[in-house]
Amino acid sequence: MATIGRRAYAEMFGPTAGDRLRLADTDLVVEVEADYTLRAGSYGEEVKFGGGKTIRDGMAQSQKTRAEGAMDTVMTNALIMDHWGIVKADIGLKGGRIAVIGKAGNPDTQPGVDMIIGPGTEIISCEGMIVTAGGIDSHIHFICPQQIEEALTSGVTTMLGGGTGPATGTFATTCTPGPWNIERMLQAADAFPMNLGFLGKGNASLPAALHEQINAGVIGLKLHEDWGTTPAAISNCLDVAEETDTQVAIHSDTLNESGFVENTIAATKGRTLCAFHTEGAGGGHAPDILRVVGEQNFLPSSTNPTMPYTVNTLDEHVDMLMVCHHLDAGIAEDLAFAESRIRKETIAAEDILHDLGAISMFSSDSQAMGRVGEVIIRTWQTAHKMKQQRGKLPGDSDRHDNFRAKRYISKYTINPAIAHGISHEVGSVEPGKWADLVVWKPAFFGIKPSVILKGGFIAMAAMGDPNASIPTPQPVHYRPMFGGFGGAIAKGSLTFVSQAGLNADIQKRFGLAKTLSAVKNIRGVRKQHMIHNDYAPKMEVDAQTYLVRADGLLLTCEPAVSLPMTQRYFLF
């Protein structure tokens, strides 16, 4: 039997089991754990499209119709990177969802075929490419609609949060308050190739105004200190969430006016909620909001400006905070409020808590102390910095960083999906899930994706001059594709709503075009359900020195002086 070398094989069909590759210009290396395309029994039955290649009539392309099982699209020889594994496989898409992960081809001429390529099957060649689930950003201030395109080009395909545009309340808080505003935002969602879900305002001491927002379709409620996150408001909001199977997100009381972190924890009575910017620079009880990392009912996340900790982090935060929270630098009390939230000791500890799997999620805090297009970049920069400073994680080897890669990718894919009750639809590369997939060249991984699919159809891509004779000539930049136009928008993306809203027929009442999907199974979620990120240590924060300990271990690290995934990728 004729053979070829591993390098030649990888260049032709992409890496196979045992091959390794570097993620962008980081120190992170992943190794292919398995090759599902070998279900044919051995090498030699790979499928590939092109002149003189195998996906031709009577070869790897069968005569089967769609009704007989042929896929709508097959992504060939992809390197899937997800929380469950790092594997080589073909990916079959059908009806906007992931249908099969395995071996594609023609069952009439090839053994071990899991998915059928037919005359009606499109091919996306992924040889040498990484495929991930679309990212989920669960802390969005919907300040301007242009955020959505920015996020999509970064590899984010689901945005959850609140707001009504550049209103003062939205600058500071992720709330879409009241049924009228909620209706308008749900109607606006139809225009974008992005899965969207909205949070109502949760700050109220009586339930009626909260129920009317959930009945209007919000997926949860946001408690924000700028609206008064008192123990009474916390308890009432969680009462309503428990009754409606919706989530609560909390930005707690930085000034400790209505109570301390102990009072907030007590007010939850063990009921589940999401703790945004758990370190506290983005807001929350000063200086010890990090204590909630050790609570099973708090699902902790970080917003990206503090991640990772660098020599520039502290300097940019005071001005950022003054603008976002409508503060006046000429008022001493406002300046003191801002400075109380910026603590190098807790920011340094935040990096390590992510590496330990104690903080479970990443998000942006878009335009409100966060950068909407940098969730994925900063996740992997943090992973790189922690490998440099802390070395290998248990479970990794001298050959690879697979466990660290799975831990960090889970922070912006499966874990926010679980936390917000949408993991039945999105958050991973698994059969049955909505086909929101991102294709990356390894050298550009986490920075600039090549192709972004929404519901199995290409919605955004790095594309060259439309007047050129081929697709690749400069200027190459992100351009909306056909999945981002016309009726394809509504067919390719979901709007997440409450079950109460679905029951109230908001689709018809509000005249919504997108498919509505109800959030579910939220109230039983605990920290232990955060994949690869379920560590709940006993947290201690010294009120005088701000030093942080987890299970007695002092958490401190140096700020990074330089980072990968930065200037060399953004010359233009």
Swiss-Prot record:
Belongs to the metallo-dependent hydrolases superfamily. Urease alpha subunit family. Pfam families: Amidohydro_1, Urease_alpha. It is an enzyme of class 3 (hydrolase). Its main location: cytoplasm. Its EC number is 3.5.1.5. This is Urease subunit alpha. Its cofactor is Ni cation. GO terms for cellular component: cytoplasm. Binds 2 nickel ions per subunit. Keywords: Cytoplasm, Hydrolase, Metal-binding, Nickel. It is found in: Cytoplasm. It catalyses: urea + 2 H2O + H(+) = hydrogencarbonate + 2 NH4(+). Ni(2+) 1 binds at residues 139, 141, 222, 365. CDD domains: Urease_alpha. The modification N6-carboxylysine is found at residue 222. One of its GO terms (molecular function) is nickel cation binding. InterPro entries: Amidohydro-rel, Metal-dep_hydrolase_composite, Metal_Hydrolase, Urease_alpha_N_dom, Urease_alpha_subunit, Urease_AS, Urease_asu, Urease_asu_c. It comes from Polaromonas sp. (strain JS666 / ATCC BAA-500). GO terms for biological process: urea catabolic process. Residues 134-572 form the Urease domain. Heterotrimer of UreA (gamma), UreB (beta) and UreC (alpha) subunits. Three heterotrimers associate to form the active enzyme. The active site is at 325 (proton donor). Gene3D superfamilies: Metal-dependent hydrolases (3.20.20.140), Urease, subunit C, domain 1 (2.30.40.10). Pathway: Nitrogen metabolism; urea degradation; CO(2) and NH(3) from urea (urease route): step 1/1. Ni(2+) 2 binds at residues 222, 251, 277. Carboxylation allows a single lysine to coordinate two nickel ions.
